[in-house]
Every structure is written in C-alpha cells, then in structure tokens.
Amino acid sequence: MLKGKVFISASAMVTSLGEGVERNFSALLRGEVGVRRVVNPRVSQSPVTAGIIPDSVYDALYERYDRQRTLTLTEIIAVHCISSVLGNRGADGIGLVIASAKGNISLLEGHSAEWTEFHEETGEVAGVVAQHPDSPDSPGAGSALLLGPMARRIASRFGINADDTFVVSNACISGITAVAVARRLILSGRYKEMVVVGVDTQNRFITSGFTSFKSLSDDVCRPYDESRCGLNLGEACGAMLLTTEGDGVCISGAALTDDANHISGPSRTGDGLYFAMRKAMSEAGADNVDMLQMHGTATAYNDEMESKACSLAGLQNVPVQSLKPYFGHTMGASGVIETIIAAEELRNQILAGTPGFETLGVPMPLNISRSNVELPSGKPLRALKTASGFGGTNAALLLEYSTQDGLSCESPVKVNADVLSTVLVESSRILLNDKEVYSLDSGDFQDFIRSAFKTVCGPNMKFYKMDSLSKLGYVASEVLLDGIEYGEEDCGLILSGVYGSLDTDIRHQQIIDTETDASASPAVFVYTLPNVVEGEISIRHHIKGENTWFWSDDRTLSDVREYAALSMSAQDMKYCIVGHIDFLNGRYFAKFELLVRR
C-alpha cells in the first residue's frame, strides 16, 4: 500500500448553485438545491429535471477569460476553476489531472457523418484535408471533441506541459480516480503539487442516453428513500490543488475496484464497493470514520447496493449523506466537487442533510438524515467518500481533518513491475510475445474479430452484443491471460487510447441526429464510455482489482506501465493488465501487456 498524506491546499467549484466553494457550501447548509425543471434545447429536446449552471454564470466567465468564446462550456468552467486554485502562482513543476466522463461530446452534434468519413492515416475527411487540429469542430486526432486534445487546450492556458497533463475517464468514478492518480503521483515523488479537475456539462447526447435507460426522475431525486424513482443529471466543475505539506484536510487513502458483474448495473451484493472502502481505510490506517459521503444516485439498485456495502464494512451506524439532490449527478465532476464539500464539512464539523429523505427504502440499515448533523468536536475527524459507475467501477477516498501543524507526506515510494507477456492485435493478426497465434486473410474488422473469437475464446453469446472496442479488448485479453491464475482482487486493468468510445459515440449521435432523443438505444449508449471495455474484460476474467482508463496517444505504454506499478503497490495486486486500444471506423489497434509485481 502507498502510505502517506496529501493535502488539499486550495479548491474551487462551479455548479448549478453558483460559483465558489463558500457559496455552494452555505447553500447546502441552508438546504438549497440547484436541481430544477429545465427547458433548454442544449440539454434536451424535452423538459428535464437537472442541475444546470445558469447562462449568466457562463456569460460572466466568458467575459472574464475568453471574450471571443473560443472555449467550449466545459473548457471555460475548467479554466476558471484551475485559475482560482492556482491564483497568481506559476505552473512550473505542477502536474494536472483532468477527469471527465464525456468532455466536449456536444461538439459531435451535427458532425457525426463527418467523423464516419475520417481516415486516421491520411487525416482526411471525405477526401478533404481536415482543418487545423486545434479547431474544435475538426474531425481528427487533434479535435477538442477528444478528451486528450481538450485537456491540452486547457493546460496550455496555464503553461502546463502536455507531459505533465493526465486525463482519466472512468464513468461516474472519474473524479475520485483523478484524486487517486494525483495522490499516487505525489507520493511517488514525481510531483510536489498537482491540480485535480473534474468537469462535465450536459447536452442531448447524455440526457437522451440516460432517458433510454428510464433512470431519470421528473422530481428532485430522493436518495435511499422508499419513494425514490431515479436520478437527476447535473453539470459542474471542481478543482483542488494537492500538495505534499500542509494542515487541515488531507487525503490518506484511495482505492478503486470493479464488480466484475455487469456493465450497466451495480453488484447485487455490494462486495465490489466494500472492497474499495476496506482498502482505502486500510491504506489510511483507519478502523472507523465519522461520516460517509456516498454516491447516492436514487436509482433502485445503486442505493440498495451501497447499503449492503456499508453493512459489509460495518459502517451502518455512521452518518451518511448524498449530495445528488443539491447538484444532480455531475458525472466526471461529481467525485471532485463532492470531495471538496466533504473537506468543508470536516473543517466545519457538520454534515449537510440529504434533501427529500423521509423513509429508508434500502435493505440494510443506513444512518441518514434530511437535516444537518453535527460531527464530533475536539478530535481529528475522518470521512469516507465513495462512488460507483458504469463498467462495474467503484472508488473510495479517505479524508482526514486535524488542526495539527507541520504535517507532510512520507518519503517517495519506489515500486517495480516486470512485463510477463505481450499481445498485439492489428492488421488481421494476433501476436503473443511476437509469435503469431492467429491471422485471417481479410481486412474487414468484423470478419476478423468474429473468427478470432471463435478460434481463441470460449463460448459467450454476450460477445456478439458488445461494441467493436469491447470485442477487440475481449479477444486481446483472452490471449494474454491464457493459463494465468490469480485471486479476484490480485489483478487490475489500466488501459489507454486516443479515440476511446468515439466509434460508438458516433452511432449514438447519429440516432438522435437523424431521429429524436427518444429514439436513443440503451444497448448503444452503455458503450459510450471507454472504461466499459474494461468492465467486459473484468466480467470475463473475474477481475475485481483496479480499473482505470487514461486518454493517451502513447502506444509504447511507458506512461501506463509506470502508473500501473504504483497502482499495484497501492492495491496489493500481483498482476496488472496495461494496454493501448483504439477502434474507429473499422481501423483498430490493441497492445496489451501483463505486468507482474516484483
């Protein structure tokens, strides 16, 4: 495990409740919610109940930072929050981690047909050379539609190098993942300071997808209540400056796991989330906590699962809250803005109530209240913050508050891992340790991947329902793990790519562009998150260790390999699959390595 503390030295946020940490925290304590009925064509073709940032807030930020409005809505709130936590200081030596579920996906609206004509090798769209790569609307590897280029556009505003910019997209746990990544990189000695950003804005792409799952509530959501009937979406940005020294609130434990059960529904037992909670507490040396800040989406199965995880962890008597009624589910931003609120609650020794809660409606006991709850005074306080999401992902952070001065993190941690085997899939060939194990005389991906599946994989009818990226990862992992045995928590999965789920994003966007939002398919939408390929692999191979997705163009795997070694130490994993995987318009590449810890 990676023992040590990193400190929250500054924070900032923009939500549907307004701009600024103090403003948002004060609103929570008053019971004010930012979720309301919204009629906004940017967000949905029909009215929706959501936490949407007022146009006046965006207008003020554009006036301050970007009067020409060259930045997207997602980018402008990220720029503001980063600027707020950095203040007048320079960015020399600072690392940046940006978390987002869908980033600038709104740029795809009306442009999906252009992307289907994009050819990666030539950079051409339907025979026409693509626009300058910095143009947000330009199809290509430099398009701001992709999270990697989006992050670089933001980082360049502050003089932060691309090599010091990391981008994670782990569905609903993206924000907590980013905090965990930053903490580990600081404890490794690579950085002394890191900025963590979580950001997502709403649009038709997202709302139509969640509507297709019938998971949205027309009323303000009611987490854990017997009358809960679904979630509310939201948009927000939060940023924190994490440092090696400080006082006040620190992060002393972090853990990520996977259910290995289902790509769109949580475990029915709660064991995956429980594993994350247990590991985060163990890493921090904590045997109990003073407050629990859970994901609390107000969907039937999520809230049920969380109650079971709390029971498994023996924390059923600890005061619990969900912040979703205040902000909505802000996706990639949620883990960051909610961690910021948890830090404020520890500092002020008060837990904000969960609006709308009346009668417990989950199978296991939870200590939840709609009113504010005072936390113990005169002692160090601990909070456990959790999240879960599509792909079966789970995450937990352990926060501590103490008035003791002069604390600092421990000495840098050195860890190592060796490459046990390598699989390469491209050009209708599969190579294992440079030896061909399968090939097909066909350039068509679908012909190749179906034939490869029948040859190197066991029977699984669910394979044919997967999107192309998941099929590619499924086959590559089958070859890589052949004959390898491990415990379910002893193996992790850390992948990267340039295009992520873009191929399926295009399919989803084409449906709502050519038809209506109501025509969206849940069978398509579930694959519009890149980490879902990891979920499919985890289900097949019973992998309940860490799952993380990085946006990266590094096919050498040097970055993910270095980070995986840290993850293996933090999570006590013996093995970890690392890889780079891409699929777009029939073109594909997958390189997976199996690492073993020394």
Show which residues each predicted segment covers.
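Glycine-/small-residue-rich beta->alpha transition segments that form the dinucleotide
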Residues: 200
